[in-house]
Swiss-Prot record:
GO biological process per UniProt: cellular response to hydrogen peroxide; cellular response to oxidative stress; defense response; embryo implantation; eye development; male gonad development; negative regulation of blood vessel remodeling; negative regulation of collagen catabolic process
Gene3D superfamilies: 3.10.450.10
Site positions for Reactive site: 31
Domain of life: Eukaryota
TM segment ranges: none
UniProt-recorded name of the protein: Cystatin-C
Main location: secreted
Organism: Rattus norvegicus
UniProt keywords, alphabetically: Disulfide bond, Glycoprotein, Protease inhibitor, Secreted, Signal, Thiol protease inhibitor
Keyword Signal carried by entry: yes
Range of residues in the leader sequence: 1-20
Positions annotated as glycosylated: 99
InterPro entries associated with the record: Cystatin_dom, Cystatin_sf, Prot_inh_cystat_CS
């Protein structure tokens, strides 16, 4: 009788250890950056602002626009910090043109230019303000 009880206790101990070792997602820390959907309205506004600032700061004759958002994160602070990793591409639209929405990317090798950029945008939605707090790009 003691042997089956001992076996049952051993089995329960093994199961308890196995259950304790299973991976669980770590608890989310309040105020820590979290992943965001690139199609989210706030992310899109932050992206548009960052691209606009990128083009203002560029001495290129052509506008650039986002090819894709590689990663988007957001952090709730006294507003919202958006952290965006973006692949940028040079378009055929010159700086004198204002509408970038339909600007195709250059396809001629000597005019093509791509960059990987990291933008940090501080947004206060209830005030309607955006600030580009950090920006770094490297040729892709």
């Amino acid at each position: 009788m003691a042997s089956p009880l001992r076996s049952l206790m051993l089995l329960l101990a093994v199961l308890a250890v196995a259950w304790a070792g299973t991976s669980r997602p770590p608890p989310r820390l309040l105020g820590a950056p979290q992943e965001a959907d690139a199609s989210e309205e706030g992310v899109q506004r932050a992206l548009d602002f960052a691209v606009s600032e990128y083009n203002k700061g560029s001495n290129d004759a052509y506008h650039s626009r986002a090819i894709q958002v590689v990663r988007a994160r957001k952090q709730l602070v006294a507003g919202i910090n958006y952290y965006l990793d973006v692949e940028m591409g040079r378009t055929t639209c010159t700086k004198s043109q204002t509408n970038l929405t339909n600007c195709p990317f250059h396809d001629q090798p000597h005019l093509m230019r791509k960059a990987l950029c990291s933008f940090q945008i501080y947004s206060v939605p209830w005030k309607g303000t955006h600030t580009l707090t950090k920006s770094s790009c490297k040729n892709a």
